Amino acid sequence: MANSGLQLLGYFLALGGWVGIIASTALPQWKQSSYAGDAIITAVGLYEGLWMSCASQSTGQVQCKLYDSLLALDGHIQSARALMVVAVLLGFVAMVLSVVGMKCTRVGDSNPTAKGRVAISGGALFLLAGLCTLTAVSWYATLVTQEFFNPSTPVNARYEFGPALFVGWASAGLAILGGSFLCCTCPEPERANSIPQPYRSGPSTAAREPVVKLSTSVKGPLGV
């Protein structure tokens, strides 16, 4: 029962992390224009993501444009794209395996050991999905930080962390935590000869052969 509860907790945590990974991948606010220094002179907020760039007017109107060329993109954007897409695919496969392998489902009840291994495989894939997301988000954030503190970067061209990065960090943490819980629910190994054998006692003293006593008395010549 304890393992079943831990599996459910891990599954819902990892599932929430996977949904967050999808949201982080789709959001265009991976970095946003900084309002430090003289950059506040403009009333337009700029956002850039993995798939598009957006401009937000002070009136609330937002205009987005998809990137025209794949090859013209920077290497870190292409790498982040690949890692996030791989994380989404791994999370989908992990979700299916976890549902099949959890004890609360009826699939594969005839083989509990194999069922537990399937659940562990799902947890491992959730871990990989979280690590891919963590790598992509942290790498992107590092480059944004380097550009921000680069003296050659104009003040009005500097960017800060966007909401998508924080969503990605939180989602990666949930996926890693949930996957760890699923991996901790290891199936108990089957014990050979688990059926107790009946106890056999040795032969009782009552079944032993009777001991014949020989008379050692000596009679005289007259039989007295």
From Swiss-Prot:
Protein topology in the membrane: Multi-pass membrane protein
Pfam families reported in the protein's UniProt record: PMP22_Claudin
UniProt cross-references to Gene3D superfamilies, sorted A to Z: 1.20.140.150
Transmembrane feature ranges: 8-28, 82-102, 118-138, 161-181
Protein's UniProt keywords contain Disulfide bond: yes
GO cellular component terms given for this protein: apical junction complex; basolateral plasma membrane; bicellular tight junction; cell junction; cytoplasm; mesaxon; nucleus; paranodal junction
Localization terms from the record: Cell junction, Tight junction; Cell membrane
Domain of life: Eukaryota
Protein's GO biological process: actin cytoskeleton organization; apical junction assembly; bicellular tight junction assembly; cell adhesion; cell junction assembly; negative regulation of cell migration; negative regulation of cell population proliferation; negative regulation of gene expression
Disulfide bond positions: C54-C64
Classification via InterPro entries: Claudin, Claudin_CS, PMP22/EMP/MP20/Claudin
GO molecular-function terms, A-Z: cell-cell adhesion mediator activity; identical protein binding; paracellular tight junction channel activity; structural molecule activity
Record keywords, A-Z: Cell junction, Cell membrane, Disulfide bond, Membrane, Sensory transduction, Tight junction, Transmembrane, Transmembrane helix, Vision
Function according to Swiss-Prot or TrEMBL: Forms paracellular channels: coassembles with CLDN16 into tight junction strands with cation-selective channels through the strands, conveying epithelial permeability in a process known as paracellular tight junction permeability. Involved in the maintenance of ion gradients along the nephron. In the thick ascending limb (TAL) of Henle's loop, facilitates sodium paracellular permeability from the interstitial compartment to the lumen, contributing to the lumen-positive transepithelial potential that drives paracellular magnesium and calcium reabsorption.
Subunit organization: Can form homo- and heteropolymeric tight junction strands. Interacts with other claudins including CLDN3, CLDN10, CLDN16 and CLDN18 with highest affinity for CLDN16. Interacts (via PDZ-binding motif TRV) with TJP1 (via PDZ domain).
Family recorded in the similarity comment: Belongs to the claudin family.
Protein name in UniProt: Claudin-19
Lineage: Eukaryota, Metazoa, Chordata, Craniata, Vertebrata
Name of the encoding gene: Cldn19
